[in-house]
UniProtKB/Swiss-Prot annotation:
<feature type="disulfide bond">
    <location>
        <begin position="55"/>
        <end position="114"/>
    </location>
</feature>
<keyword id="KW-0964">Secreted</keyword>
<feature type="signal peptide">
    <location>
        <begin position="1"/>
        <end position="19"/>
    </location>
</feature>
<keyword id="KW-0430">Lectin</keyword>
<keyword id="KW-1015">Disulfide bond</keyword>
<feature type="binding site">
    <location>
        <position position="155"/>
    </location>
    <ligand>
        <name>Ca(2+) 1</name>
    </ligand>
</feature>
<dbReference type="GO" id="GO:0042802">
    <property type="term" value="F:identical protein binding"/>
</dbReference>
<dbReference type="GO" id="GO:0005615">
    <property type="term" value="C:extracellular space"/>
</dbReference>
<dbReference type="InterPro" id="IPR013320">
    <property type="entry name" value="ConA-like_dom_sf"/>
</dbReference>
<dbReference type="GO" id="GO:0001849">
    <property type="term" value="F:complement component C1q complex binding"/>
</dbReference>
<keyword id="KW-0034">Amyloid</keyword>
<feature type="glycosylation site" description="N-linked (GlcNAc...) asparagine">
    <location>
        <position position="51"/>
    </location>
</feature>
<dbReference type="GO" id="GO:0030246">
    <property type="term" value="F:carbohydrate binding"/>
</dbReference>
<dbReference type="Pfam" id="PF00354">
    <property type="entry name" value="Pentaxin"/>
</dbReference>
<keyword id="KW-0106">Calcium</keyword>
<comment type="function">
    <text>Can interact with DNA and histones and may scavenge nuclear material released from damaged circulating cells. May also function as a calcium-dependent lectin.</text>
</comment>
<dbReference type="GO" id="GO:0006953">
    <property type="term" value="P:acute-phase response"/>
</dbReference>
Length: 223
């Protein structure tokens, strides 16, 4: 292969693997269990988080535990982790500590998940399909470290790696947004209804991401 064609091939591969794009109406599909398949979400977050709200849609027929959103920093695993323990049980980890919220839900079925946390009060709250669950207290006064590695599809036990097949996600994830504030109920309901506010940490309509392994982008057909 001559040099111009080689560089075009390399550039095309980089653009495919490292993209910044509007994913409206689309999802990441994770078709299999693995220790390799994942998506890295890139954000220029330079300051520790004192508050946040994270919302996304997911669809899986797994009955075992799995990671939905894994945020690690240097030397700190489970700095921020959204984890499904089993059907009807969702956990939020902040700084390796966790709370779990329970909800009656159909299985298997698509779900819209929002979770918020506020450092000053320590209050963490899940919203499932537009309905708030019982508030819990978690790590009052703590700050979530900046410069994270954020992974979909796997649970990190190190900074960007050390994955476990038994915690991998199989299914679809889309409409993911993250803000550096606790959204009021009306804005969470707007996200559930498909009209979210512009997000300043992660925004599905302007997402910087990197696909690793067998992950496919497909149309969202289950909302």
């Amino acid at each position: 292969m001559n040099k111009p064609l080689l560089w075009i091939s390399v550039l095309t591969s980089l653009l495919e693997a490292f993209a910044h794009t509007d994913l409206s109406g689309k999802v990441f599909v994770f078709p299999r269990e693995s220790v390799t398949d994942h998506v890295n979400l890139i954000t220029p977050l330079e300051k520790p988080l004192q508050n946040f709200t994270l919302c996304f849609r997911a669809y899986s027929d797994l009955s075992r535990a799995y990671s939905l959103f894994s945020y690690n920093t240097q030397g700190r695993d489970n700095e921020l982790l959204v984890y499904k323990e089993r059907v009807g049980e969702y956990s939020l980890y902040i700084g390796r500590h966790k709370v779990t919220s329970k909800v009656i839900e159909k299985f298997p079925a698509p779900v819209h998940i929002c979770v918020s946390w506020e450092s000053s009060s320590g209050i963490a709250e899940f919203w499932i399909n537009g309905t708030p669950l019982v508030k819990k207290g978690l790590r009052q006064g703590y700050f979530v470290e900046a410069q994270p590695k954020i992974v979909l599809g796997q649970e990190q036990d190190s900074y960007g790696g050390k994955f476990d097949r038994s915690q991998s996600f199989v299914g679809e994830i889309g409409d993911l947004y993250m803000w550096d504030s606790v959204l009021p109920p009306e804005n969470i309901l707007s996200a559930y209804q498909g009209t979210p506010l512009p997000a300043n940490i992660l925004d599905w309509q302007a997402l910087n991401y990197e696909i690793r392994g067998y992950v496919i982008i497909k149309p969202l057909v289950w909302v």
